[in-house]
């Protein structure tokens, strides 16, 4: 196969702009799938991907296409995840391509995540050309959207392909553009093997399957290969391509995209962005851009039924097989029992994992409030990182605490700007800029503490803007902040699962809301229950759940006041004793309340 007949490309699009449907049409047109095999969103393998209409893992497929110039071309479509949490995975998938189709919904225009991914593509020197999808919709405004693409992204859009993936309009034109506009890969088949690993997953029969793009050299069955970041060697047991079902091939040469199965046991060894080379004759310099993915958001997962603990552990281990960016370790809580502390890339990643646990493994879970990674500088000069309030050292040992900040860019219709600005200010944001992209669309850029974003920022942004705003963020740095640990005390006992790290300025308001919410949820006992929010020894808010009491004076018709007083005193004594020995059962809702306390 000649290297100049290969085209490697990916499709960049915002959620719901029609990326997976377009991929379906390309598969159908090039005859990769028969009518019988065709199902909607063929490349999205997980039910969850189909349902939410998002792509979570990268997939590849090889198409063969006879172009108008009479030549046969091999087109490798690399399907990338489009969501902000998976930015690193996207950048590695894009590094495997020479070009990209920018698919924009002709009725909605350019969105924040599209923009982030286009910039990633441009950073990787990809040839990007625009495709306007959904032109069959009555609300489509192709001219306005073309103008937006030119204004916002700076791409020439006058000859953008008009398409409707649903109706199959424009599919052939797109294939022709791919052949004409995207350059063939460059690479030397005779050089030592150098290949980019851009995705991996676990198959229970064959071990870890890795997707690679060969940059230089060739790899064939039986070769000894090495992964550069770990230095471990394996034997290539199978070499092949997805067309779109797995098919073995004799070898993969420079410029080609395919899969390798090499008896790798653990997906954590096959790191995305790693370089694959020959063990005996390695390449001199590995590929650049590799970095270890670290979880940014942490949350505790506990089974509601403690008998499901083992099942939860097995389920987490299974998910980890396919997702090395997810981490978990056991933890115990006095209030919730045994569970796990899990680390995620971001909020969407967290939601997807929780939903998969509940759906695929039938588990009922309680999730504690999400937290981020803080850096605590201690007085003795060392720095420790913590993910939960319970790991915070005593106040007298702490010099200062740093928290992570992100740079958020929010795209929104202009009528919602006021609401978004006040939301960002309330979340301790620092305004960077406000840019009018078109007379009706605005881009707002803010620096925000990640701690404030993980709780409910995204939901509130969507409700303020009726779902029209889109959010994209990147991690900036760590900054010094006045953070404190707030404890919730029930009858003087701190409840570990309810502690949280919070900014001092907000602690009073949050504490007050929390204790009043808890007062509604804790059922009345035979003795009074005192709920307090405290920072260190200082109580900042308090509520009391009054005791239930029997009417002890019912049997005294008239009689002396001292008799009544004696009975009341006796009852009071009894209640006091009870309070010392009684313990309060906290209902499950009390923990969920913490997650749902809206900051006023």
Curated annotation (Swiss-Prot):
Role according to the record: Required for accurate and efficient protein synthesis under certain stress conditions. May act as a fidelity factor of the translation reaction, by catalyzing a one-codon backward translocation of tRNAs on improperly translocated ribosomes. Back-translocation proceeds from a post-translocation (POST) complex to a pre-translocation (PRE) complex, thus giving elongation factor G a second chance to translocate the tRNAs correctly. Binds to ribosomes in a GTP-dependent manner.
Taxonomic lineage from the root: Bacteria, Pseudomonadati, Thermodesulfobacteriota, Desulfuromonadia, Geobacterales
Substrates-to-products reaction catalysed: GTP + H2O = GDP + phosphate + H(+)
InterPro entries: EF-4, EFG_III/V, EFG_V-like, EFTu-like_2, G_TR_CS, LepA_C_sf, LepA_CTD, LepA_IV
GO biological process, one term: positive regulation of translation
GO CC annotations on file: plasma membrane
One Pfam family hit: GTP_EFTU_D2
Membrane topology: Peripheral membrane protein
Enzyme class: hydrolase
Cellular localisation: Cell inner membrane
Organism of origin: Geobacter sulfurreducens (strain ATCC 51573 / DSM 12127 / PCA)
Name of this chain's protein: Elongation factor 4
Residues reported in the UniProt entry to bind GTP: 16-21, 133-136
tr-type G domain residues: 4-186
